[in-house]
Regions:
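Transmembrane helical core of 7TM receptor-like proteins
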Residues: 1-286
Length: 286
């Protein structure tokens, strides 16, 4: 539940910055990332928390479908936005910015189109959650063969082709962004090492402190992403290959899947001075 106030604080800070025309492309991506993480927590974390405290959440087929649909789309956008943030940060701290300037401007110009395209892609891919979701009370999900089990609902596919086809698309998409994150992380580590060596040899030569701080923040997000979503994807592939479905795998997926959306806002707040200043200002007014 700590992710809700954290993501709301990020959204409020960046919404204010956008209204004041005082924002950067990285902050736009961070704001959208906070929105995606907030939707993940509201559709996955809140029901689980209520269930842990003994509050029964009554779901029917419609509410299961809508909840899982919003969750899956938001989770996919969270992955995409994190990878985009890493790639954009690599362009910003490139040792030869003149060579990357044209690519950077091209990405900035196409950023809205890229966002819309990814939204449409994920809305289409995740539509199976709308059509085939049902509550646990409607069927014994653990005994069904072609089933993806969530904590309060499940998705029962009508055919092997749709089951494995949809799973393959999900795994391929997640693995693509995992590879992209790994490459971005490796490049950022390489730049940090090169910068450290240059600082030892030429103390007067240094990169802007704000760029280093922002890059380290993104590096932390990438590492958190690789840990949480990487393990989640592993459990997802096990879920596809194991029948009947084990609830332990579903619980493990839930835990690793929720870590990133809940903890990443704390890292963003601790490393972003604009958000810290906004929070101090709000507390001072009170």
């Amino acid at each position: 539940m700590i992710g809700i106030p954290g993501n709301l604080a990020i959204l409020c800070a960046f919404t204010k910055a956008i209204c004041q025309q005082n924002f950067t492309p990285s902050e736009i991506i961070l704001g959208k990332l906070a929105l995606a993480n907030l939707l993940v927590i509201l559709t996955r974390g809140v029901p689980l928390t209520l269930q842990a405290f003994g509050v029964r959440t009554m779901y029917d087929g419609l509410t299961c479908g809508i909840t899982l649909y919003i969750y899956c789309v938001s989770r996919a956008m969270s992955i995409f936005l994190t990878s985009m943030l890493g790639c954009f940060q690599c362009l910003l701290i490139a040792p030869c910015p003149s060579r990357c300037l044209r690519l950077r401007h091209s990405i900035l110009e196409k950023l809205p189109s890229i966002m819309i395209s990814l939204w449409c892609f994920n809305l289409l891919v995740c539509c199976t959650r709308l059509f085939y979701s049902m509550p646990h009370t409607g069927t014994n999900c653990t005994e069904e063969e072609l089933t993806v089990v969530y904590d309060f609902c499940c998705v029962v596919f009508p055919s092997h082709l749709l089951y494995f086809g949809n799973g393959a698309v999900f795994v391929t998409r997640d693995m693509f962004f995992l590879v992209l994150m790994t490459v971005s992380s490796g490049y950022l580590l390489f730049v940090f090492r090169q910068h450290g060596n240059l600082m030892k040899r030429l103390p007067m030569l240094q990169m802007k402190h704000s760029e280093i701080r922002a890059a380290k923040s993104v590096m932390g997000l990438l590492a958190m992403y690789l840990l949480s979503f990487g393990l989640d994807s592993v459990f997802w592939m096990v879920n596809l290959c194991v029948s009947p479905v084990s609830l332990r795998f579903a619980d493990a997926r839930m835990f690793f899947d929720s870590c990133y959306s809940a903890i990443s806002p704390m890292l963003i707040i601790l490393t972003n001075r604009k958000i810290q200043a906004g929070l101090k200002c709000a507390i001072g007014k009170r």
